[in-house]
Every structure is written in structure tokens, then in C-alpha cells.
């Protein structure tokens, strides 16, 4: 089994460089990821908690938590199946602040799978007047990133997974991409 990653995503095992920034990890021990067998239970639990759409989007895009929670409906282009990532939410001085993403390279357009777009359109029907893709059920505004993380942590515990931080879901995407591509560079 050979899965291709950027070097910063590999935590151990035999590593072979195959390009300037791509490496093949064989028999590696990755950073914490959500195992493939736990993805369905994770998504089922997310659905029970009312957050299937953001968690599904996370698994198909690997967005940072702040990027995910700052998304607005205007960022989604249904026809072209793209999502514009151009802002992030974070807590500063006790208040939620929406600003530009972590780095200039973080401003990007992401192509979405058709099933992800369909799920997002269904999510929009649940709260059509709200500008946020995933509004907080408490406030109707953007989710507090810490509260969203705590809900993710609760779901991880419910499904019996070893601790997988929300940020680790980005690494899960790398592995899913490797499985979907038949363990080759796609």
C-alpha cells in the first residue's frame, strides 16, 4: 500500500520522495485520523446532532474549522460546484471575529463533489433566510469555533474512536483521497 502525501502529513514509516513536494508513505503511522470504518458512524452521529452538512463538507474538502464556520451562501456556486474560501472566524478578545484566512494561499476556490453540493442545497432549505451556510442553532450567527469543536469531540467519543481532533479531519481527507485514487497521485 502506497499513499501519497505532502511531507508534513506523514508521521512515520518508510518514506520515499517521488517529487519535489510529494512523498510516498509505506506502512506509515499517520497523525490521528478518522479511520475509514468509522466515517459512516461519524456521519450518522453528526446527522443526529444536526451537523451532517458541515461535517460532510469537512470530510470532502479538509477546510480549517474557522474557514468552514465562516462560509456564507454567497460563497457557494451551485452551478459550477465550487466553494470560495475567503474568510475565517476566530475568537479574539472574547468576541467572534470574521477575517481573512490564515495565509494568503488559504484564499482559494474548492471544487465540490456533486453529492456534497446536493447536501448543501438541502441544508440551505432548512434556513433559507440565514446568510451563513451553517448557522449556530443557538444564535443564528456563525458557530463559535470552540463550541463546534466540543460537539465534534462528543461525536468522536460517542462512536468510540480514539481522540481525533477536528483539525485531524484534514488528514483524514488526505487518506480518503488516497483510497479514492487507488493509492496513486491524482
Where are these regions (language model features)?
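Short, flexible, glycine-rich and Lys/Arg-enriched loop motifs at helix boundaries
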Residues: 87-105
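Basic, Lys/Arg- and aromatic-enriched nucleic-acid-binding interface segment
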Residues: 22-73, 78-79, 90, 106-107, ...
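Active-site/catalytic core of tyrosine-dependent DNA strand-transfer enzymes
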Residues: 80, 88-91, 113-162
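Generic structural detector for well-ordered beta-strands
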Residues: 84, 109-111
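Short, polar N-cap/turn motifs at the start of nucleic acid-interacting alpha helices
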Residues: 75-82, 162, 181-186
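C-terminal catalytic core of tyrosine-transesterase DNA break-rejoin enzymes
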Residues: 56, 60-67, 147, 151-156, ...
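N-terminal core-binding DNA-recognition domain of tyrosine site-specific recombinases/integrases
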Residues: 1, 9-11, 28, 140-147, ...
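N-terminal DNA-binding recognition helix of tyrosine site-specific recombinases/integrases
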Residues: 1-13, 19, 64-66
